Amino acid sequence: MAFVGPTGSGKTTIIRLLCRLYEPQSGQILIDDIDIKDIPIATLRNMLGVVLQDTFIFSGNVADNLKLNSNLDNLQLENLCYELGLDNLLKKLPEGLNTSLRERGGNLSSGERQLLSVARVVIRNPVVLIMDEATAFMDPSTEATLQKDLERILSKRTALVIAHRLATIESSDKILVLKGGSLVEEGTHSELRLKKGLYFQLSELQQKGFVNF
């Protein structure tokens, strides 16, 4: 599922509500029919995997960056990387999982850093994967390449994606269009294009290079 809308429409607020950084003034947020208010905050946040637009790669090797505090051994990690389709990336690196990385991933491209940051969260196997404008700082060419990897990683997973470039969420099962804190449209990319509403307008403007939100 993807959220789109102009700046200030409430996209990031929804993510903060889901993480219980804010509490809703009315209504409910349910995960598997359970009100998140009934889930201890620590448990809830362990259920969620959040990828933000600002990635952080620390100095160390690739394996350490991916495992963090998990108990995975390198063989398990290699198998997971293969399942996630990271083998092509690892083949590019001189020592694969043992390749040393500079702080903030200075020896990786922006797309490679983002792919590792997404994989790091996915490896935890969260109940819900949340991506908050995770490709915001990429040029369109890098983003298009990364998008193919993300579509494979996100398949068969529950994912909420906040998008600033509409081309990245065209394959989403459902797109929710927000404006001024309200839901104004919902549907697939094709359905929303046919409605000729706000989504259509934003899509047309963005294709012409006028809007990037």
Task: Please describe what each predicted stretch is.
Residues 1-213:
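ABC-type nucleotide-binding domain
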